[in-house]
């Protein structure tokens, strides 16, 4: 290899010594432009280009270097460039070694400039050129390694320094690209001589200790440099001076008029709609029809030209939240002079709906067949489509939160309440209007769900059982707790940089997982059709499975008791929608309560098992056991439930409402609901109604449970009276638990249960809500207050989110503290209880181990309490959003999972005198949230002795009845809370003492803890034996939390020397905080890392180490779901992840183990094939129903719309990569789509430019469609004026891309023919429109737009008009690459492209200065837009 290099050096010396290249290239091989700033190369050969860049005569122009490495790939290969630079380097060494002084000076200057070129190339374009090309890396390393001998001997020292710097540059870049590759540290290179002699190996040549090839992982920097367009654009701009303001070329006033006309025509036909814009000549091409028209054909209708033949609907923002609703909630006045505003309730229903009787003959007919009942029909159809069931009456499936959010954010209904408005205009607007275009977007997603349900029905029908949706598919589609948190409960959104506009509801992932589920279910159905049904296994083998199903059904059954008063917190008019049996508008059984304000109710927590369901059925077990997993948590039943759980969206806190319905036929369906008295008795542990939370024990005749008065109980809940229609009457006495002086408990009143059957379920009084227990019942809970001797307790339902919470101690077991005193436990019978001796021995052994562990924990707890390390207070008035970590992790006593046992020692016999003075709200972790601010949080933990005594408990006796308990903890089971805790300020999160709920969020706490404990590469939560990670956690805690360090030092047993001091810079690295200085010192080899003392052993000997390890372990970080570290403040977006992983550099280039893609990867093509089967069939969304359409833009003010459109366009432009622009990587024709969802499915095949163009054209189509579908002249006038105002605000925000979208749409032939609406436009708005209309003029090749783009104020932000840049690049691309083929390069062409690209990416980067908050509701509507097809527009405009 070195011999080859010598040959190249000889040939290079001969070429660069020629007269045309020495000392600088002559005019015969290179041409410069006359005048201008700096040197502008017009044409040259490749050798002359290298000679000019390394010329020892001309001045250094760093911008010329940067431009060259951006464009050289268009006419020169990377390997050829490396050969030329090697030849120039060797030629310089030859000149230095010559005897002449002049030649030596020329050689030294040329050598330095050649080194600068090589270093610039390696550092800035390693990921672009060297990373994917192994041969190029090997060639470069062979060249650099061969310079070690040439630099020795009698050569000048400058040569040795350059060689060492070049090797350090390579090592520095390698350390940036790979995470675990540090050549300097690994090979101990500490001197210049060591660097000279060191032979740099390639990453593919490194071996492990076992002799295997090392598998190095690419760093985050490498992946971003390879796949993230925004990061790559920012890296390119960093190579230039920040003060540079790159300009677009502007034509002179005296340019050729004929040429300008030619450019005008050709530019318009490239990207925009020539036949739609009045600024361009219209064509007579007929639109192509690819779909069957959903409307009758009219041959006599006059044909006009309308939207372009290619609907390049935007591809860009594939993942922002669905449009919140296609309905209008408020009409803002179109102009300031119009003092008129209509307020619309999106959940309003005309009074006739409330009077709807259950009898079909008594129902009142609406005025229009497509009135509000069409709206309710759509909602009901979507709701029922979400449920996977066998019969229409079966409502046992759970509605996916993501799909409910989709409907919630998309659908809205217009209703007008105008006390001072134009009465005549109000009468002309129907109260049942909604945005049909937005509803179409929902319908497309619902189509996929329908297909999934149909396939699921086939699968389950073959099995002869109730359909159960695949839990894995559901979990993959809708992630658990953290990802399902309500959007309003997220951390407050900052500026747009902290908000992922492209990924709001993650619709791309939702659609992908639905399609994956459909394909998997289809394969399963085809496979099961050929299988022979096998007989069920023996009953003995089914017991574990049956037990699992029994437990699962019991835990979910308890959810049915989460009751609340039959009232509403919000008094505004709203629509109450019960799920109908079908999508039919006249379906029977739908009724609306007239006594209360109606509400829109989305059912997200339907019951799996009902209070009337029998828990155990041997035959059912035999039928289902072979198909049920041991850990199955989804057990469904075809019988209708007694209650429906609903969630309202009228308030920030969702209320769970439990209503009984459809019980008239329940008794005959459950005649076998009585208990079998021959079954063995199961003793229930005190305070635990969930079977998962207590141990199974054999019952003996002498046990206290044997003497308990037996009542009919429900096996799934432990509730008395397990008959199908048993309802607890509101008049029944409520048992009150009292404690006598001797410590025994008794009930004050014994409730009586009556079996009642009601035919009219809606005539009942609302049920008394049952007790709400804390969701985490570890080592006892507040249930001790009322579960002592209650013979018939109402079951205590767990919080629905408990399954996602961390509920076990670090040991993974659940223990229950037993209290002294005579008591009896409620009993229930278990059909599966094993009374054999072996089972009894195991039970006794487990009980002994449990007691031993409890004793150890009590001892450890006592030791920690006496240490005195409690200084922080638990104050609600704090300004921080979370409690300090040292309070959270002070001791095991303060752990969230250990605090539940604190309240078990509260006695029940104290006076309740202070009950009415200050109501107490029970925390799910046992923290007294009503304590005064002056009380210390540690004080609540340091007095266990006082708490055990009734006389010392100030809060005892406050909740002695079920009613009192419920009143003070009525929010404890809110489904959207993390652990069911709400303080006085409405803050429902545990560790957030802020004043409002907006400052508190579980994700905030998670991110705080993650930042403090999970910043290391290895998992921060370590097992007890991982001492190294423990030391890192302790060190990080002390660095981030000074108070924790102070606490540690207060312990007299700890050695102060064991604490790791913060890292300090050495004397020679005083400026190491400057990244530029650090980089230079690393390149020169003068940077030395401060020595770190190994204090691991001393730390591990500290008694605090094991305590902290257990505390951190109890937080169970490994089971919590965190977003990826690279998107700390952003939601995960599968759409963005797919776009970032489409280009594989090599096997490890795009691997990211932190990416949580729950479902198997399915190509967009396969998903599109499923969506192609969709055809619009719902008549309510047909264009024949346009009289009920109203644009959602009338719901918001123009400034808000302009802001959200600006955020969207910023994200769109960030997807355009500089190299795609230089190469003009774009499709000649884009797919014809009419909705954003359809574009989502073209993610893998569209470049950033294609996305931007498609988004642009879709927006134009959408604006035209909104105006075409608005039949009311005044509403259309208002919509046009609203769009004019939006465009004007966008112009002020320097968002010229949106300005052009609106202007082109309003100036289209289709919209301009609405002369009756244009006549009503206000004169001031017409003046604004005339000014806006002049901006996109094609005269002189967008002369007006170019002047605006060249005069932008960077601080205000900017969204450039993409079409201007694409037209310039397209015109410039028609020039020749070579003036003389393969000899003389037309370098001016490529340098012009660079100037255009730099101007574009610079203005896109200026968009970061926008300070705009994302409005989730409006943003969703603006992103997930839908447009009419060209045929539909032609049909509507033909009359």
From Swiss-Prot:
Principal subcellular localization: cytoplasm
Top-level taxonomic group: Eukaryota
Biased composition (Polar residues): 699-711, 822-832, 1054-1073
Coiled-coil residues: none
Span list, region Disordered: 525-552, 699-721, 790-832, 1041-1073
Alphabetical UniProt keywords: Cell cycle, Cell division, Cytoplasm, Guanine-nucleotide releasing factor, Mitosis
Keyword match Transcription regulation: no
Occurrences of domain Ras-GEF (ranges): 1197-1438
Localization per record: Cytoplasm; Bud
Cellular component GO terms, alphabetical: cellular bud; cytoplasm; plasma membrane
Residue intervals of the N-terminal Ras-GEF domain: 37-167
Family annotation (SUPFAM superfamilies): Ras GEF
GO molecular function per UniProt: guanyl-nucleotide exchange factor activity
A GO biological process held by the record: asymmetric protein localization to new mitotic spindle pole body
Functional summary from the UniProt entry: GDP-GTP exchange factor component of the mitotic exit network (MEN). Fine-tunes the timing of the mitotic exit and couples this event with cytokinesis. May also be involved in proprotein-processing in the secretory pathway.
Sequence similarity: Belongs to the LTE1 family.
PANTHER family the UniProt entry points to: GUANINE NUCLEOTIDE EXCHANGE FACTOR (PTHR23113), PROTEIN SON OF SEVENLESS (PTHR23113:SF363)
Protein name: Guanine nucleotide exchange factor LTE1
Gene name of the record: LTE1
């Amino acid at each position: 290899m070195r011999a080859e290099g010598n040959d190249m050096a000889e040939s290079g010396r001969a070429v660069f010594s020629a007269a045309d290249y020495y000392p600088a290239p002559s005019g015969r091989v290179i041409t410069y432009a006359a005048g201008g700033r700096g040197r502008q190369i017009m044409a040259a050969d490749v050798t002359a280009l290298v000679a000019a860049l390394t010329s020892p005569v001309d001045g250094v122009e760093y911008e010329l270097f940067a431009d060259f490495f951006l464009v050289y790939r268009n006419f020169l290969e990377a390997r050829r460039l490396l050969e030329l630079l090697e030849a120039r380097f060797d030629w310089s060494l030859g000149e230095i070694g010559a005897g002449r002084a002049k030649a030596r000076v020329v050689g030294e200057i040329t050598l330095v400039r050649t080194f600068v070129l090589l270093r610039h190339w390696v550092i800035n374009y390693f990921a672009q050129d060297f990373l994917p090309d192994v041969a190029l890396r090997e060639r470069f390393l062979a060249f650099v390694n061969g310079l070690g001998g040439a630099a020795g001997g009698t050569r000048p020292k400058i040569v040795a320094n350059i060689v060492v710097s070049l090797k350090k540059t390579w090592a520095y870049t390698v350390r940036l690209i790979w995470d675990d590759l540090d050549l300097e540290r690994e090979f101990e290179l500490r001197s210049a001589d060591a660097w000279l002699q060191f032979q740099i190996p390639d990453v593919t040549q490194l071996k492990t200790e076992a002799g295997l090839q090392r598998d190095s992982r690419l760093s985050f920097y490498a992946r971003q440099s390879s796949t993230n367009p925004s990061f790559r654009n920012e890296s390119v701009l960093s190579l230039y001076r920040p003060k540079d303001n790159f300009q677009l070329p502007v034509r002179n006033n005296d340019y050729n008029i004929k040429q300008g006309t030619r450019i005008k025509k050709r530019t318009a036909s490239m990207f925009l709609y020539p036949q739609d814009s009045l600024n361009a000549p219209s064509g007579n091409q007929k639109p192509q029809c690819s779909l069957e028209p959903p409307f009758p054909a009219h041959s006599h209708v006059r044909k006009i030209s309308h939207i372009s033949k290619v609907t390049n609907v935007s591809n860009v923002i594939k993942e922002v939240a669905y449009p919140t609703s296609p309905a209008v909630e408020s009409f803002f006045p179109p102009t300031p002079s119009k003092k008129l505003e209509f307020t619309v309730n999106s959940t309003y229903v005309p009074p006739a709906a409330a009077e709807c009787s259950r009898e079909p003959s008594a129902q009142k007919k609406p005025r229009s067949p497509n009135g509000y009942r069409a709206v309710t029909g759509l909602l009901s159809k979507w709701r029922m489509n979400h449920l996977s069931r066998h019969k229409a009456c079966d409502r046992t499936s759970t509605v996916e939160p993501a799909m409910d959010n989709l409907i919630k954010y998309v659908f809205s209904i217009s209703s007008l309440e105008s006390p001072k408005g134009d009465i005549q205009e109000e009468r002309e607007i129907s109260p049942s209007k909604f945005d049909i275009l937005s509803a179409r977007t929902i319908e497309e997603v619902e189509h996929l769900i329908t297909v999934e349900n149909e396939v699921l029905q086939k699968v389950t029908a073959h099995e002869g059982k109730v359909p159960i949706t695949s839990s894995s598919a559901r979990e993959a589609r809708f992630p658990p707790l953290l990802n399902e948190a309500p959007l309003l409960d997220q951390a407050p959104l900052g500026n747009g940089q902290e908000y992922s506009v492209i990924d709001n509801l993650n619709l791309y992932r939702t659609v992908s997982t639905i399609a994956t589920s459909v394909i998997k279910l289809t394969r399963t159905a085809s496979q099961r059709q050929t299988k022979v049904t096998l007989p069920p296994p023996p009953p003995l083998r089914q017991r574990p499975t049956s037990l699992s199903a029994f437990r699962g059904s019991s835990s979910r059954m308890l959810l049915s008791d989460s009751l609340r008063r039959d009232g509403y917190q919000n008094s505004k008019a709203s629509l109450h929608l019960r799920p109908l049996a079908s999508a039919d508008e006249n379906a029977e059984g739908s009724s609306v309560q007239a006594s209360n304000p109606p509400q829109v109710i989305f059912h997200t927590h339907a019951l799996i098992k009902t209070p009337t369901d029998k828990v155990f059925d041997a035959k059912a077990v035999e039928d289902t056991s072979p198909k049920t997993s041991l850990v199955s948590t989804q057990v469904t039943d075809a019988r209708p439930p007694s209650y429906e759980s609903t969630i309202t969206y009228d308030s920030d806190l969702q209320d769970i409402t439990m209503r009984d319905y459809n019980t008239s036929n329940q008794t005959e369906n459950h005649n076998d609901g009585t208990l079998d008295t021959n079954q063995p008795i199961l003793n229930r542990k005190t305070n635990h109604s969930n079977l998962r939370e207590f141990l199974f024990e054999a019952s003996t005749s002498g046990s206290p449970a044997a003497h308990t008065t037996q009542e009919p109980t429900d096996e799934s809940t432990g509730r008395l009276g397990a008959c199908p229609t048993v309802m607890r009457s509101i008049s029944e006495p409520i048992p009150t638990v009292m404690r006598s002086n001797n410590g025994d408990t008794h009930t004050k009143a014994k409730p009586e249960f009556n079996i009642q059957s009601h035919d009219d379920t809606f005539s009942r009084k609302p049920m008394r809500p049952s007790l709400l227990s804390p969701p985490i019942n570890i080592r006892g809970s507040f249930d001790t207050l009322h579960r002592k001797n209650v013979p018939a307790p109402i079951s205590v339902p767990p919080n629905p989110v408990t399954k996602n919470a961390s509920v076990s101690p670090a040991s993974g077991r659940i223990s229950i503290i037993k209290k002294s005193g005579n008591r009896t436990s409620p009993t229930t019978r278990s059909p599966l209880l094993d009374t054999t001796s072996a089972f009894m021995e195991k039970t006794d052994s487990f009980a002994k181990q449990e007691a031993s562990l409890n004793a150890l924990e009590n001892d450890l707890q006592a030791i920690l309490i006496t240490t005195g390390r409690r200084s922080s207070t638990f104050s609600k008035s704090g300004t921080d959003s979370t409690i300090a970590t040292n309070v959270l992790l002070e001791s095991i006593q303060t752990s969230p999972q250990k605090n539940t046992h604190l309240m078990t020692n509260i006695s029940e016999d104290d006076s309740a005198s202070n009950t009415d003075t200050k109501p107490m709200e029970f925390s799910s972790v046992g923290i007294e949230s009503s304590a005064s601010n002056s009380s210390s949080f540690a004080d609540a933990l340091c007095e266990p002795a006082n708490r055990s005594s009734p006389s010392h408990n100030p809060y005892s006796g406050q909740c002695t009845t079920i009613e009192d308990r419920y009143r003070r903890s009525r929010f404890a089971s809110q489904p959207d809370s993390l652990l069911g805790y709400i303080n006085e300020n409405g803050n429902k999160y545990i560790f957030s003492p802020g004043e409002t709920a907006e400052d508190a969020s579980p994700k905030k706490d998670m991110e705080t803890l993650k930042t403090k404990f999970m910043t290391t590469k290895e998992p921060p939560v370590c097992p007890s034996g991982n001492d190294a990670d423990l030391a890192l956690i302790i060190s990080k805690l002390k660095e981030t939390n000074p108070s924790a360090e102070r606490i540690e030092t207060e312990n007299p047993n700890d050695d102060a020397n064991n604490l790791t001091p913060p890292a300090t810079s050495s004397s020679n690295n005083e400026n190491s905080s400057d990244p530029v200085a650090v980089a230079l010192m690393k390149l020169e080899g003068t940077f030395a890392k401060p020595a770190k003392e190994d204090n691991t052993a001393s730390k591990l000997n500290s008694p605090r180490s094991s305590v902290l390890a257990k505390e951190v372990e109890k937080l169970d970080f490994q089971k919590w779901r965190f977003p990826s570290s690279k998107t700390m403040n952003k939601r995960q977006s599968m759409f963005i992840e797919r776009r970032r992983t489409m280009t594989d550099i090599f096997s490890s280039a795009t691997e990211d183990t932190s990416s949580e893609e729950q479902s198997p990867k399915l190509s967009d093509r396969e998903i599109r094939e499923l969506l192609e089967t969709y055809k619009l069939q719902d008549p309510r969304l047909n264009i024949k129903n346009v009289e009920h359409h109203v644009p959602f833009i009338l719901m918001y003010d123009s400034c808000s719309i302009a802001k959200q459109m600006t955020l969207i366009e910023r994200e769109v432009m960030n997807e355009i990569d500089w190299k795609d622009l230089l190469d003009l990587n774009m499709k000649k024709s884009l797919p014809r789509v009419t909705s954003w969802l359809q574009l989502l499915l073209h993610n893998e095949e569209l470049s950033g430019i294609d996305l931007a163009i498609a988004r642009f054209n879709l927006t134009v189509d959408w604006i035209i469609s909104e105006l075409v579908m608005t039949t009311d002249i005044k509403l259309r006038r208002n919509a046009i004026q609203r769009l004019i105002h939006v465009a004007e605000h966008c112009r002020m925000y320097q968002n010229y891309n949106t300005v052009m979208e609106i202007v082109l749409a309003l100036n289209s032939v289709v919209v301009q023919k609405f002369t009756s609406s244009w006549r009503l436009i206000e004169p001031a708005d017409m003046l604004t429109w005339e000014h806006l209309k002049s901006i996109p003029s094609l005269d002189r090749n967008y002369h007006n737009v170019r002047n605006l783009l060249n005069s932008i104020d960077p601080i205000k932000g900017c969204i450039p008009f993409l079409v201007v840049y694409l037209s310039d690049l397209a015109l410039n691309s028609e020039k020749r690459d070579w003036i003389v083929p393969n000899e003389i390069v037309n370098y001016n062409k490529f340098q012009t492209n660079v100037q255009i690209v730099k101007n574009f990416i610079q203005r896109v980067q200026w968009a970061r200065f926008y300070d705009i908050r994302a409005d989730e509701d409006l943003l969703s509507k603006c992103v997930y837009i839908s447009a009419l097809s060209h045929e539909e527009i032609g049909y509507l405009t033909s009359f």
